[in-house]
């Protein structure tokens, strides 16, 4: 028997689903990251998984985001496309939420620290207390590991299987 590995992308994915034997599918969280990203506006932070305060956010990257920062480390896994991450120091005293990331004003991002160009399968650290932004010439998908924050959107009723 031959097996074929197929990697999903924003342009080509199969939703899949939860197959239950003797239970209610509503008891299980199932969503397809590519489907969530395909329906999202660029740079929305849409939770696709949650464990206590920790979340995985699906982010559609298209164009250049505004500057963001968090008081804690985050990581971003590129699932589709190519994403350039740009990092700058953050203005001293810039307020940040206790959890999650938030947009920061353009002038709060000061000295250029560097950049990372990441493609499918590349994991990029988004360091605590530093400004970052991401950009992509075409649609790309990130999975961001973070803590639930003020801009995290929960759309369980829209994205999870219910029957």
Give residue spans per PLM region.
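Short beta-strand His + acidic residue motifs that chelate non-heme Fe in jelly-roll/DSBH
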Residues: 67-68, 85-86, 114-116, 124-126, ...
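A short, N-terminal "cap"/entry segment at the start of jelly-roll beta-barrel domains
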Residues: 1-58, 64-66, 159-163
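Short, surface-exposed beta-edge/turn micro-motifs
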Residues: 54, 72-75, 140
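Short, charged/polar surface micro-motifs in flexible loops or helix N-caps
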Residues: 50-53, 61-64, 81-84, 90-93
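A short hydrophobic beta-strand segment most commonly corresponding to one strand
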Residues: 138-156
């Amino acid at each position: 028997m031959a097996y074929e590995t197929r990697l999903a992308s924003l342009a080509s994915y199969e939703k899949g689903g939860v197959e239950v034997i003797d239970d209610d599918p509503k008891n299980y969280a199932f969503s397809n990251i590519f489907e969530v990203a395909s329906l999202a506006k660029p740079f929305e932070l849409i939770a696709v998984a949650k464990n206590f305060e920790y979340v995985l956010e699906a982010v559609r990257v298209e164009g250049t985001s505004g500057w963001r920062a968090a008081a804690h480390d985050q990581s971003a896994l590129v699932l589709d496309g190519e994403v350039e991450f740009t990092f700058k120091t953050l203005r001293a005293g810039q307020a940040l939420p206790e959890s999650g990331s938030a947009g920061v004003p353009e002038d709060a991002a000061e000295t250029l620290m560097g950049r990372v160009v990441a493609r499918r399968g590349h994991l990029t650290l988004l360091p605590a207390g530093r400004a970052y932004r991401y950009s992509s010439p075409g649609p790309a998908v990130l999975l961001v590991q973070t803590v639930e924050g003020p801009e995290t959107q929960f759309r369980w009723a829209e994205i999870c299987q219910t029957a």
